[in-house]
Swiss-Prot record:
The active site is at S189 (nucleophile). This is Dihydroorotate dehydrogenase (quinone). InterPro entries: Aldolase_TIM, DHO_dehydrogenase, Dihydroorotate_DH_2, Dihydroorotate_DH_cat, Dihydroorotate_DH_CS. One of its GO terms (cellular component) is cytoplasm. One of its GO terms (molecular function) is dihydroorotate dehydrogenase (quinone) activity. Belongs to the dihydroorotate dehydrogenase family. Type 2 subfamily. Its main location: membrane. It comes from Arthrobacter sp. (strain FB24). The gene is pyrD. Binds 1 FMN per subunit.
Amino acid sequence: MRVYPTFFRLAFSWMDAERAHRIGFRAIRLAHSSGAGRVLAKFTAPAPSLQTTAFGITFPSPFGLAAGFDKEGHGIEALTELGFGHVEVGTITGQAQPGNEKPRLFRLVEDKAVINRMGFNNDGATAVAPRLKSARAALQRRHPGVRPVIGVNIGKSKVVELEDAASDYLVSARSLAPAADYLVVNVSSPNTPGLRLLQNVETLRPLLKAVGEEADKAAGRHVPLLVKIAPDLTDEDIDDVAKLALDLGLDGIIATNTTIGREGLTSDPEKIRDCGPGGLSGAPLKARSLEVLRRLKEATGGSLTLVSVGGVENARDVQERLDAGATLVQGYTAFLYEGPFWAARINRQLAKHPARR
């Protein structure tokens, strides 16, 4: 019998979602700082058979934590102790910013979903960079072989105009690339005004080219570069982004971010309206995310690393994404509903799957 669903219902379901997130994340970090996390890691570490190589890096497991949970790099080590093969930090912007007004995070428990309009609240690239450097060094010390991987997701500062977006992304790339195992350009969040316009290939091409060059220069090595796209793109737009990624020699595409759609929800319509605008994540995104993955697989012919995220709840979902062409799979929303042993449970079940790769 699993205890966490009952604990969630009693302790967290009545609480403001953002406050519950803060408390839960603090508990995870406390387990690490007390030493309990290291003991826990002996039981949650992915089986060696799960090791996966993507863009020249070996990951302990194909399953990792998507951007959004640890926005500022405060708990990277602690989260890897729960079994995640990689942790994607962010979204981080060139300038520190408070994000949108609260409340800005809402649960739709009946749908196992979340609506957020956080707005990239973070300390800014300059403040986050030392945390990434420290976490990377610590993971290298603790894992002399294959270690958990640190991804860094960067976005546009809200106060920066769209025409100046490239220079803002370059600030982040310059500061963060040296401590990043891979870098993600986020142009698909619905919560920064105008950001999704950057998904237009004519705008996206020079942005990605500039970020890639700046990241490699700052790090003194090639930093794998990926772009994260929205599920709301048309098939034609998806094909265009795939072609652009191939033309530029990008290392991969992450699909998908949250959706602005509200189709197929079972939660009370009035409750959904009360949540207001924002990106929807969780189980309702499952079908569309898989659809986009398959489209990208066909469009790229397997030439790029595809990272699938959106509606991933269990090992079956992870396996389905791997079978559909993903090299890596990420989750986040189900972590809030399933509890701290979610990643370890998925890894155990994946390791039992004889045809995983």
